[in-house]
C-alpha cells in the first residue's frame, strides 16, 4: 500500500530508526534498514521509480519482498495439498489438517 509521506515520529523503541508515518487516521510503523545491492539491481530499481512504476526505491524493494513472501506461502500450501490429499482427490484429509492447524494471522 502506498501512503503519502506524512509526519515522521523519530526514534523507535529499538533505537534503529523505527518511526511511524502518519496520514490522517492511517498509521503505519516501519523500520529502516540498509542493504547492499549490485549496481544493476539499483539501476533497475531507479528505472522503476523514474518510470513511475513505484513511488520510491523502498516501494520497489517492498513489492519484491511481498511477492517473494506470497510465493513461499503458495509453495507451502502446494506442499500441504500434495501430502494431505489422497490419490482419489478426496479432500477430507486436507480439511482435517486445516482444522488442526493454527492460523498465522497478525
UniProtKB/Swiss-Prot annotation:
GO biological process terms on file: detoxification; negative regulation of growth
GO molecular function: toxin sequestering activity
Chloroplast in keyword set: no
Keyword annotations of the record: Toxin-antitoxin system
Conditions for induction: Mildly induced (about 4-fold) when grown in a non-replicating state.
Known function: Antitoxin component of a type II toxin-antitoxin (TA) system. Upon expression in E.coli and M.smegmatis neutralizes the effect of cognate toxin MazF3. Overexpression of MazE3 alone decreased persister cells formation in M.smegmatis upon challenge with gentamicin or kanamycin.
Subunit structure: Forms a complex with cognate toxin MazF3, possibly with 1:1 stoichiometry.
UniProt protein name: Antitoxin MazE3
Name of the gene: mazE3
